[in-house]
């Protein structure tokens, strides 16, 4: 049942469905929630988002005995770590600091992340890495998400979750479903409007400024 999305079909200022590799799918409402590909997908609808795509690397170690019961985050080093059911340590840190759609990273970030981990837990320096990869993050300008209608009737957008997309999925989906069903934002998502950047109402919780790689 896999389909490759080509573009949204816009007629007279309204989205009437999507063009896919298996033909056209008509819809009264179309929701876009594609994380790191947000800017490219919405560009096909003629929109330019206040979002940049950046690479975030993740790492997995060899299997070890249970040592981490949950998830540990280290704000001082921007590091997080958990342990999988197979015993591998799953960890990561900061983005690679340049725009990219490539799902691979660079070595300076590998060194930085591993040093951050050993600062928190020196003993993991002896663990051997077995896998690493890069995922594409949809980094908004203020570090906060967007859940809103677009200027195109029938087209809705949910993105800009930065690092927190996977962890925020339940709440994100609940708020987005409410918007799609009622055409009004959920009470917990009223501030996540698309036009907040134009109006000067950014949600910069960290106080880092309007620069994606600082969030």
Can you say where each PLM-predicted feature lies in the sequence?
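Short, small-residue-biased leader/transition segments that mark boundaries at the very start
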Residues: 1-5
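Glycine-rich, Trp-frequent "lid" loop and neighboring beta-strands that shape
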Residues: 6-7, 20-22
């Amino acid at each position: 049942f896999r389909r490759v999305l080509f573009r949204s079909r816009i007629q007279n200022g309204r989205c009437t469905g999507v063009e896919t590799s298996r033909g056209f799918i008509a819809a009264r409402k179309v929701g876009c929630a594609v994380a790191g590909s947000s800017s490219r997908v919405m560009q096909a609808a003629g929109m330019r988002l206040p979002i940049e795509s950046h690479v975030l690397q993740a790492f997995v170690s060899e299997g070890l005995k249970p040592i981490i019961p949950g998830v540990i985050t280290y704000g001082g080093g921007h590091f997080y770590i958990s342990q999988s059911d197979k015993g591998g340590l799953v960890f990561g840190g900061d983005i690679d600091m340049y725009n990219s759609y490539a799902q691979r990273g660079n070595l300076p970030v590998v060194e930085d992340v591993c040093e951050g981990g050993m600062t928190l837990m020196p003993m993991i320096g002896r663990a051997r890495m077995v896998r690493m990869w890069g995922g594409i993050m949809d980094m908004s300008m203020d570090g906060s998400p967007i859940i809103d209608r677009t200027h195109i009737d029938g087209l809705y957008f949910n993105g800009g979750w930065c690092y927190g997309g996977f962890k925020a999925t339940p709440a994100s989906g609940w708020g987005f479903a409410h918007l799609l069903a009622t055409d009004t934002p959920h009470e917990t998502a009223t501030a996540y409007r698309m036009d907040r950047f134009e109006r000067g109402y950014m949600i910069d919780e960290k106080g880092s400024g309007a620069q994606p790689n600082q969030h």
